[in-house]
Structures are given as structure tokens and as C-alpha cells.
Design a protein with these regions (language model features):
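Cofactor-binding loop segments of dinucleotide-utilizing enzymes, especially the Rossmann-like FAD-
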Residues: 18, 41-43, 111, 160, ...
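A Rossmann-like FAD-binding core segment of flavoenzymes
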Residues: 35-39, 77-96, 102, 174-270
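Glycine-rich Rossmann-fold phosphate-binding loop(s) that bind the pyrophosphate
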Residues: 17-20, 137, 158-163
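FAD-site-proximal beta/loop scaffold in flavoenzymes
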Residues: 128-150, 224-230, 235-305
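FAD-binding core/adjacent interface of flavoenzyme oxidoreductases
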Residues: 1-10, 69, 73-154, 230-232, ...
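Mid-to-C-terminal Rossmann-like scaffold of FAD/NAD(P)H-dependent oxidoreductases
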Residues: 8-12, 285-382
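C-terminal auxiliary extensions adjacent to catalytic cores
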Residues: 2, 355-412
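Beta1-alpha1 glycine-rich phosphate/pyrophosphate-binding loop at the start
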Residues: 2-78, 168-191, 385
Length: 412
């Protein structure tokens, strides 16, 4: 599939989106020998970058340019600041916000996700976020937040998932007192169990971040600028800087308007094909076998499979799902979580090792002699050996307890 018979015209592949999945696809397509006129359309004014590192840009650890991702340049063309507003799947054309039309032979949707903004009273003023309130999804968001943080006295982060914890840690590093309001009983509940969540909370407290789990924000206070966050119980947290970190929702508007099958995300099969001929979807916007991953690892895997198929390097390549690893790198608060980590799972045994002095916590979930899930918090010395065993479904040694110890895992 590396060439298309269209007379002298080159095959045209359009990629809507210029984030991690899009950049990875373009790079792998070209490195695999793919031949096409490959164009990426990015609504943001910047080249592709790694959103996972936004908190480190906020603290000043990295310059924005340092998190830029390769996208196969110069073989691929990247059109920044170019929003696609409509897709004609029958005519195989895109309509751009500037009125221009662009034809394609094959289309890859890598539109990513939008931040979820909860229905908080006082969140908007004149159709914009109230002054002092911020989302945290893009480099532009990061720049605005950094500018506001210089003048701020107290910050509240609404949402205690991965993004919220990252933002809180970064704001604390800038010298701000920070409070997290989180509706769930403990932090990062999608990846961590209660014990790990509590250990993470203690680590944040040591950095100057307080946490209010099991609480819901219902309103922002302030006249023209945020002065506080009102909780559902009526208590008000003083703040002149608020970060909304309530997760993300697949960006499916273009696909839906074009008539593609959409549930939570754009529905794709094992070939990453959508319901429209010649149209594919990868990354945060894609729903495969009922799952929207929303993680970097699966996005890369999907991009690699689609690049192999469309380049002709492996036309039979299939994406059958991921065994994703969720990871947060935040100094002493770093963690990794994978697989099934819930309690009372049928047919499983659980091994735990906690060190309150070091603030570390490890948990392995076993089914027979196989590792089916794990949590590592504060000490990732064993993460390589354990994730390899999980991803490969390798049998574990007869006494797996030593795998919780760095030296034991290294010898395995």
C-alpha cells in the first residue's frame, strides 16, 4: 500500500490533529518506507509536543521547545494554526476554518480530547473562563497559568486525577499553597487503590499540597476574578488561582458531523478503520472494542499499527488492544500502575509491601503464576521487570514475593 495508482499524482494522506498520536503515525509511516503526500493539520499554533510534560514546563524544568515531538519532517508537512471544520467522506475533502478545501485519499483522525469543564456556578464570564480560572491541556494553557501564578497567593486544583496531581505539584514547586478538591474517596482512583492514594496524599502534604477527598466543588466566588471555591457542603476555600483538571473527553465532533459511528469515541475496528471507507482514527479520540484508553502508550501502539498498514510495511498488522501502563513522574511522588488493581478480584492473590518511612507502596495482583496488575508508588526500581512480565504474560517464579524488592526483581 506504499503507492497508489492515480496517474502521476501522489497518494494523499491527511492527518487531522498534530498531537502525540499524529506525530508518531507520521514519523513511523515515513520511517517504514511509506510514500505519500502526508499533511498534518494542527489547530494549535505550535508543532506537536508531549502533553505529559506540561507540568514540567510550568515549573520551568523544561522550555516549551524541549517537549516538541518529531513528526517525520521534512517528509511530512505540518500546517499549524489550521483548524479542520468539516469532513466530506464521500468527496474525500476537508474544509478548513479559513475557507480552503483540501482533498485526501486516506484520512487519519487524531483529534485528541477536550478538557472536561464541570457545570460550576461562576466558571464563565462573558463566555470565557473567569479570570483566575484555567484549564490545563495545552501549552497556551500552560503559559497563561504560569503568568497568573506569578501574582497569585493561593491555588485550588479541582480534580485529583493524574493531571490534577501534576498541576498541584507544579504550583507548589512555584511556591504557592495549593489545595486539591477531589470528588472520589482518594486520589487517582482510576489507577491507584485506597492505600496508594493515601500514601500519595501524604507525599503531597509534605510538598505543601492539602487534599480534600470526597468533596465536590459547586461554584467559584468572585466578581470579575476568582476569590474562592465553594464546596458542596458550603465551605469556601480561598483562592485567586483555580485549575480545572476534571479529565478529558474524546474530541468527536468532526467525526459525528461527518456521519461516522461514534459512541464515547470514534468507533474503530482492529485495523483502526472507522465506519467510513478510507478513514481511520487513533489516539485519545478512538474507541476500540468499547475502550477509550486516553493514555500515551495505547496511542503510540495504534499509531504504529496504522503506520505499518498504510506504509505497506505490514499490511496485515492489527491492533487487538493494549496492556497500558499509567505513569506519573513527579520526584518522590512518582508512580506506575498497570492491569487489574482492584480488591477482591476473583481468583487472584495480592502481595503488598509498604514503607511509611520512605513513602513507598507496592502491590502485585496475581492470578495463578501470572501477574495481572500492579501499583508501584515512590520506588520504581522494579517497574521494568514487572511491566515486562505483565506485558508478555510471563510465568512468575515460585516465590514471587522477592519481586517487590529491587534486587530480587533485577535477579529474576
Amino acid at each position: 500500500m506504499s503507492a497508489v495508482s492515480n496517474g502521476a499524482r501522489r497518494r494523499r494522506i491527511a492527518v487531522v490533529g498534530a498531537g502525540l498520536a499524529a506525530a508518531r503515525f507520521a514519523q513511523q509511516f515515513l520511517e517504514s518506507g511509506g510514500e505519500a503526500e502526508l499533511t498534518l493539520y494542527g489547530a494549535e499554533a505550535r508543532p506537536a509536543y508531549n502533553r505529559v510534560l506540561l507540568a514540567d514546563v510550568l515549573t520551568g524544568r523544561y522550555d516549551p521547545e524541549a517537549i516538541t515531538l518529531p513528526y517525520g519532517e521534512p517528509g511530512a508537512r505540518l500546517r499549524t494554526g489550521t483548524e479542520v471544520v468539516a469532513i466530506d467522506v464521500r468527496g474525500r475533502t476537508l474544509r478548513l476554518a479559513n475557507g480552503e478545501s483540501a482533498a485526501y485519499d486516506e484520512l487519519v483522525l487524531a483529534t485528541g480530547a477536550n478538557p472536561v469543564l464541570p457545570p460550576l456556578r461562576g466558571l464563565y464570564a462573558d463566555g470565557e473562563l473567569t479570570a483566575g480560572a484555567h484549564s490545563f491541556r495545552t501549552l497556551a494553557d500552560c503559559a497563561r497559568l504560569a503568568e497568573d501564578a506569578v501574582r497569585a497567593r493561593r491555588a485550588v486544583v479541582i480534580g485529583g486525577g493524574v493531571l490534577g496531581v501534576s498541576a498541584a505539584r507544579a504550583l507548589a514547586a512555584l511556591g504557592l499553597p495549593v489545595e486539591i478538591v477531589h470528588q472520589a474517596p482518594h486520589l487517582i482512583e482510576r489507577h491507584l487503590d485506597e492505600q496508594a492514594g493515601q500514601a500519595l496524599r501524604r507525599g503531597l502534604l509534605a510538598l505543601g499540597v492539602d487534599v480534600y477527598p470526597g468533596n465536590r466543588a459547586r461554584a467559584l466566588h468572585g466578581d470579575g476574578r476568582v476569590t474562592g471555591v465553594e464546596l458542596a457542603n458550603g465551605y469556601v476555600l480561598a483562592a485567586d488561582l483555580v485549575v480545572i483538571a476534571c479529565g478529558a473527553r474524546p474530541r468527536t465532533g468532526l467525526a459525528h458531523s461527518a456521519g461516522l459511528a461514534v459512541r464515547r469515541g470514534v468507533v474503530v475496528d482492529d485495523c483502526l478503520a472507522t465506519s467510513a471507507p478510507g478513514v481511520y482514527a487513533i489516539g485519545d479520540c478512538a474507541e476500540h472494542r468499547g475502550t477509550v484508553h486516553g493514555l500515551a502508550g495505547p496511542a503510540w501502539e495504534q499509531a504504529d499499527v496504522l503506520a505499518a498498514r498504510l506504509s505497506g510495511a505490514d499490511p496485515a498488522a492489527r491492533y487487538t488492544g493494549s496492556r497500558p501502563l499509567a505513569r506519573l513522574t513527579a520526584g518522590p511522588l512518582e508512580y506506575a500502575a498497570f492491569g487489574e488493581v482492584g480488591e477482591d478480584l476473583p481468583g487472584t492473590d495480592v502481595l503488598r509491601l509498604a514503607d511509611a518511612t520512605r513513602g513507598s507502596y507496592k502491590k502485585l495482583v496475581l492470578r495463578g503464576d501470572r501477574l495481572v496488575g500492579g501499583i508501584l508508588l515512590g520506588d520504581l526500581g522494579t517497574v521494568g521487570a514487572l511491566t515486562r512480565a505483565y506485558e508478555r504474560d510471563d510465568p512468575l517464579p515460585a516465590d514471587p514475593l522477592h519481586l517487590l524488592i529491587t534486587q530480587g526483581a533485577a535477579q529474576w
